[in-house]
Amino acid sequence: MAHESKGLPGLRGTDHIGITAPDFDEAADFLENVLGLVPFYQMGPFGSDDSDWMKDLLNVHPRAVIRRVRHYRCGHGPNIELFEYESPDQRKVMPKNSDWGGHHITLYVDDIDAAMDHLRAHD
């Protein structure tokens, strides 16, 4: 049965989800050694001392610097993009799920009990 969409033409799915972590190394360790995600691309640092391209393209402070960004494969779902930012106006309070910008990611596993045991063992 064909479904006619009024949405974005040619939309096929989600490619990646970007996350800015307060501690890049700790987040990378969790993604790689607890979840088992596979890193496949890294770049950085980059920013600008003399233009507003960070503000214009990424909606961050013009002098913000992306220290590192690393992409991870996550099974057959969207990839995870991990960021480490440094910015003069950076807020360092984690949003609650009810706050604007609050979020969560749900993973699909074959055995929820085995997955929970694995996560608890790495707590």
Regions found by a protein language model. Give the residues of each.
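Basic/polar N-terminal segments that are highly enriched at the extreme N-terminus
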Residues: 1-8
